Amino acid sequence: MHQVKGLHEYDKKPLTWMLDSIFSIRKLRFPMLHYQTIPVTAFEQNCSVLWCDQTQEAAVVDPGGDLDRITGFIQRKGLQLKQILLTHAHIDHAGGTATLAKEQAIPIIGPHEGDQFWIDGLPEQSQRFGFPPAGHFTPNRWLHDGDTVQVGNCLLSVRHCPGHTPGHVVFYSPEIQRAFVGDV
């Protein structure tokens, strides 16, 4: 193959240049949702930290407990915690919600209002299962089937999935084909 003088390095490797361009455009134009699953409580239920790579804004899904582990991860990643998302109000998923919301001054989003009686019973649930005392809270926003929730520049669709609890919801990200399902 002949060398042509004056060509840019990428002209010698068109496939590399094309791939670099595609990935650079992807980073500039389209936000990507990232997540880390953190098992919490004696039940080791899946709490997830979600964040947008463009804004570094984060949400915590189902902070059932072990708040130091959750906030430690968020701090290490340099994320800005903006909200709590709840799939349902059982103690292992919602036990740390009131404390985290108060400490971080962030809103609580979800679940569906069908779980109001579970929220009201969180203090009793924590005693029954030997969890740290759970505070009572009122969500800033109840969720319904077809709603969307924003994490930074990323959107999650909401599906109401009663069964495990009357107000259980699921959060779905079509861009990463991942659902955050609680106990469904």
State where each predicted segment sits.
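Short hydrophobic alpha-helical segments enriched in small aliphatic residues
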Residues: 3, 9-11
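Conserved beta-strand hairpin/beta-sheet module of binuclear metal-dependent hydrolase folds
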Residues: 31-77, 170-184
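Divalent metal-coordination and catalytic microenvironments
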Residues: 50, 62, 88, 100, ...
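Metallo-beta-lactamase
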Residues: 124-125, 148, 154-184
